[in-house]
């Protein structure tokens, strides 16, 4: 069975490579997506991407994804620290979830 993974990125991650390069580097979100696609092809996985700056859109997408994927990876950006609603939407899912960040959130 081919694993289907969704990678979700939250607010301002669409501007990777343009903002705070000293913190986030020079790579764009498209660069990250291309790296993920290359990895997924080598490992017989199917990967999809979603990005939004809007909390409600992220929640709707998470809820709508609950039966379509075998795993979810999320970088919720600033919502990591503030959104109980996104946290609650993720708790609904019955698939593995990985939360990740580009920078060390404990050094802020």
Model-derived regions: residue spans:
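Flexible, gly/pro- and Lys/Arg-enriched active-site loops
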Residues: 79-108
